[in-house]
């Protein structure tokens, strides 16, 4: 199970996101 804090973060790449979050199509970490 991925550990992804539920924090609103804009992103361009997965590396912009925290922990195991990835950058989704709409430019938000999730």
Curated annotation (Swiss-Prot):
Site positions per UniProt: Reactive bond: 6-7
Pfam family, one: Squash
Keyword Zinc part of the UniProt annotation: no
Post-translational modification Pyrrolidone carboxylic acid, affected residues: 1
Keyword field: Disulfide bond, Knottin, Protease inhibitor, Pyrrolidone carboxylic acid, Secreted, Serine protease inhibitor
Gene Ontology MF terms: serine-type endopeptidase inhibitor activity
Principal subcellular localisation of the protein: secreted
SUPFAM superfamilies, per the entry: Plant inhibitors of proteinases and amylases
Subcellular location per the Swiss-Prot or TrEMBL entry: Secreted
Disulfides per UniProt: 4-21, 11-23, 17-29
Modifications the protein undergoes after translation, according to the UniProt entry: LLTI-III seems to differ from LLDTI-I by the absence of cyclization of Gln-1.
GO cellular component, one term: extracellular region
InterPro entries (alphabetical): Prot_inh_squash, Proteinase_amylase_inhib_sf
Record-stated family: Belongs to the protease inhibitor I7 (squash-type serine protease inhibitor) family.
The protein, known as: Trypsin inhibitor 1
Lineage: Eukaryota, Viridiplantae, Streptophyta, Embryophyta, Tracheophyta
């Amino acid at each position: 199970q991925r550990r992804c804090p539920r924090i609103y973060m804009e992103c361009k790449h997965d590396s912009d996101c925290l922990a195991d979050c990835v950058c989704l199509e709409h430019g938000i970490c999730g």
